[in-house]
Amino acid sequence: MKYTKKEKEELKKVLTEEEYYVTQENGTERPFTNEYWDFNGEGIYVDITTGEPLFTSKDKFHSSCGWPAFSKPIDRSIIKEKVDKSHGMIRTEVRSKLGDSHLGHVFCDGPEELGGLRYCINSASLKFIPKEELKEKGYEEYLELFK
């Protein structure tokens, strides 16, 4: 599947205000009220702006932070990490590679048995593709992750 980056004007037409704010303006949605923080479906999470596969439900865990938390991305090459010194803190921001969408942040306080990382990701930056729909939506190669 080929993924393409959309222009800002096109994104304004297809994303909700919150999705645009989070992905394009480096925003953060409210904790505990977003779509995927407590969601347990089996499938993959893709960049809402490009469709790039980012995370799998197999790597999702409950962290009590109020946002979806993952131990790792599907492939580290599809994300970018950069230093974020906003809000008086030093954190590591996570962005999608192609879309350059703000996804959230990665922290070193994840479960040790899962590698020790916690990717704290905004639901508004993600679209969930259920395992049952991976083939029809063009993500058939990711079915292997669920065997």
From Swiss-Prot:
GO biological process: protein repair; response to oxidative stress
Domain of life from the UniProt record: Bacteria
EC number per UniProt: 1.8.4.12
Gene3D superfamilies: Peptide methionine sulfoxide reductase (2.170.150.20)
Residue ranges occupied by any MsrB domain in the UniProt entry: 8-131
One term of GO molecular function: peptide-methionine (R)-S-oxide reductase activity
InterPro entries named among the record's database cross-references: Met_Sox_Rdtase_MsrB, Met_Sox_Rdtase_MsrB_dom, Mss4-like_sf
Record key words, sorted: Oxidoreductase
Reactions the enzyme catalyzes: L-methionyl-[protein] + [thioredoxin]-disulfide + H2O = L-methionyl-(R)-S-oxide-[protein] + [thioredoxin]-dithiol
Enzyme active site: C120 (nucleophile)
GO cellular component: cytoplasm
PANTHER family: METHIONINE SULFOXIDE REDUCTASE, PEPTIDE METHIONINE SULFOXIDE REDUCTASE MSRA_MSRB
HAMAP family: MsrB
Family: Belongs to the MsrB Met sulfoxide reductase family.
Protein name per the record: Peptide methionine sulfoxide reductase MsrB
Species in which this protein is naturally found: Clostridium perfringens (strain 13 / Type A)
UniProt gene name: msrB
